């Protein structure tokens, strides 16, 4: 059985405040864990073989991550390495105004990847290992050894992204590493969602997956699990995903409010939003 639903240990409904509890269920000492956001929409063929091989070969890193498309820190890395040439600079901040907050950039980035997928050229983005430390990043896809969480019982703060990506490895005097020789595509941050939902990007990924008969059974099983989860948490399903509750990120909520009221459109930049292949692609 490839997929099992495991209840959140504190009985919390889906939402940001519930995520941290799962780490207490992911600390078996002889196990490697790979965690995905629920809106990872594409994995490069042989993804698991590549990521797990790197994870096994590099036990000193606390977290190992693939190259994540639509992740601000990964976008900065692609820009720095000359793989992409965006119209504006993307900074190393995981909440970068462009790499995290600009929906039109996310659409351009997805279209860039989709073009490479169709041409069978995603390996052109591969750039080896890149170590990162003391820098928070969006943990859209991460891998760890259960034995590394076991000493502290897998207890992670509600602000689990900062804990897992920066605070815990700092306390352990460990670094993290992006293994960019395999790729995962992350659909959207909530700052981008309203725009990307109307872009047809999700349907393009679905079309690509539909053309892979070897995963048809897994897609059907995933659909059954999604329907079971929606039946269990109908209020979340009605929201179209995880609802935003008592977030402390006031800046994020302001952006969300502007999206919902149609005011977050980057009108002054719209004609200048573009993403070109970089010189090193």
Placement of each model-derived feature along the sequence:
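Short acidic, S/G/P-rich loop/turn micro-motifs used as interaction or catalytic elements
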Residues: 39-43, 71, 148-151, 156
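Short aromatic-enriched loop/helix-cap "lid" or pocket-rim segments at secondary-structure transitions
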Residues: 18-19, 47, 75-80, 189-192, ...
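Internal, well-ordered interaction modules that form the hydrophobic cores of assembly/scaffold domains
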Residues: 29-56, 64-66
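Short beta-alpha junction loops
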Residues: 9-11, 67-72, 182-183
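Active-site-proximal specificity loops/subdomain of glycosyltransferases
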Residues: 1-35, 44-47
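Short catalytic/ligand-binding loop motif for oxyanion handling, primarily in non-cytosolic enzymes
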Residues: 42-44, 71-76, 185-188
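C-terminal catalytic/acceptor-binding lobe
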Residues: 113-278
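Conserved catalytic core of nucleotide-sugar-dependent glycosyltransferases
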Residues: 50-150
């Amino acid at each position: 059985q490839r997929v099992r639903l495991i209840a959140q240990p504190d009985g919390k409904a889906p939402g940001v405040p519930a995520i941290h509890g799962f780490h207490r269920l992911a600390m078996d000492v002889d196990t490697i864990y790979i965690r995905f956001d629920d809106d990872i929409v594409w994995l490069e063929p042989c993804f698991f073989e590549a990521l797990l091989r790197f994870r096994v070969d590099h036990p000193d890193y606390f977290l190992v991550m693939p190259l994540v498309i639509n992740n601000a820190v990964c976008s900065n890395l692609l820009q720095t390495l000359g793989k992409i040439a965006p119209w504006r600079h993307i900074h190393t901040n995981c909440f970068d105004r462009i790499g995290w907050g600009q929906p039109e950039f996310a659409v351009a980035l997805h279209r860039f990847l989709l073009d490479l997928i169709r041409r069978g050229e995603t390996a052109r983005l591969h750039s080896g290992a890149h170590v990162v430390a003391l820098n928070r990043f969006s943990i859209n896809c991460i891998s760890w050894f259960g034995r590394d969480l076991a000493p502290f019982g897998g207890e992670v703060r509600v602000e689990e992204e900062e804990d897992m990506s920066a605070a815990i490895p700092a306390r352990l005097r460990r670094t993290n590493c992006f293994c960019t020789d395999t790729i995962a595509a992350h659909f959207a941050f909530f700052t981008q969602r309203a725009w990307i939902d109307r872009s047809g990007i999700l349907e393009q990924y679905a079309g690509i997956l539909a053309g892979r008969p070897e995963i048809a059974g897994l897609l059907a099983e995933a659909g059954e699990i999604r329907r079971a989860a929606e039946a269990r948490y109908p209020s979340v399903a009605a929201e179209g995903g995880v609802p935003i509750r008592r977030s402390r990120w006031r800046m994020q909520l302001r952006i969300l409010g502007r999206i919902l009221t149609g005011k977050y459109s980057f009108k002054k930049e719209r004609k200048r939003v573009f993403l070109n292949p970089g010189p090193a692609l």
